[in-house]
């Protein structure tokens, strides 16, 4: 379960980088500033590397060979990405983002090919939440940076919440249509509201608050709100994995 969480989070974080104009950030035109500094891309690669290695260690030594290959390759690519984005003009930086994303999507598929859409929607939500929070910290270092990157990731977070709610809602409807409501025992009735209230509703409200706060350029306050969003999304997705494991055996 935690391995899935790590893989999805690494995938989501790297996916966020595609929204931050990586080509322009790596090679800004003369006289212009990059939308986001290369150090942020380097940080995201390092965080993704940590989650890739964490997933590999969590599954070891029973990790299937194809999945192990994917995770090892993803770890190498993210390590290379962190080095590349510390160099001038970040040679190959964008290619490493795309390649890492492709390998991690393959890892998600190998983990559970029957729920790839659910895994990708979870990756989008986790990545947008944590990516927004980490980007908020960047404004403490570079307070004059454009607000466009934060707006983009907050918009991505809102879209990811809608997508995740739709995917989970559809899965829940499919399950309830094929099972008697009597199967909703005490444990399921306890965790289901937690998953939706903590993992979807609360982050949606907080996302709106962070957006309104960012509009007045109170980036420190927005970052604080996004901390809470990250915690709620983490709890919601871990609960969702528990529910998925529970109902898949019924």
Map each language-model feature to its residues:
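Polytopic transmembrane helical bundles with strong interfacial aromatic enrichment
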Residues: 1-143, 149-170, 192-250
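Membrane-interface interhelical connector segments
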Residues: 138, 143-146, 176-186
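Conserved beta/loop motifs at nucleotide-recognition and modification sites
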Residues: 172-174
């Amino acid at each position: 379960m935690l391995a899935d969480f790590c893989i999805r989070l690494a995938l989501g974080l790297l996916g966020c980088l595609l929204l931050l104009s990586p080509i322009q950030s790596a090679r800004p035109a003369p006289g212009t500033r990059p939308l986001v500094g290369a150090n942020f891309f380097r940080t995201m690669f390092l965080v993704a590397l940590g989650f890739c290695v964490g997933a590999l260690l969590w599954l070891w030594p029973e990790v299937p060979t194809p999945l192990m290959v994917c995770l090892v390759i993803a770890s190498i690519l993210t390590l290379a990405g962190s080095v590349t984005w510390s160099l001038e003009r970040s040679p190959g930086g964008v290619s490493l983002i795309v390649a890492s994303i492709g390998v991690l999507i393959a890892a998600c598929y190998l983990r559970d090919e029957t729920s790839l859409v659910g895994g990708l929607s979870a990756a989008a939500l986790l990545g947008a939440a944590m990516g927004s929070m980490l980007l908020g910290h960047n404004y403490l270092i570079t307070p004059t940076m454009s607000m466009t990157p934060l707006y983009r990731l907050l918009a991505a977070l809102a879209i990811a919440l809608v997508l995740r709610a739709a995917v989970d809602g559809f899965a829940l409807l499919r399950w309830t249509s094929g099972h008697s409501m009597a199967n909703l025992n005490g444990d399921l009735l306890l965790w289901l509201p937690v998953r939706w209230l903590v993992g979807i509703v609360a982050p949606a409200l907080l996302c709106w608050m962070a957006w309104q706060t960012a509009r007045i350029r109170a980036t420190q306050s927005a970052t604080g709100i996004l901390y809470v969003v990250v915690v709620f999304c983490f709890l919601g997705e871990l609960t969702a994995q528990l529910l998925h494991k529970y109902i898949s055996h019924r």
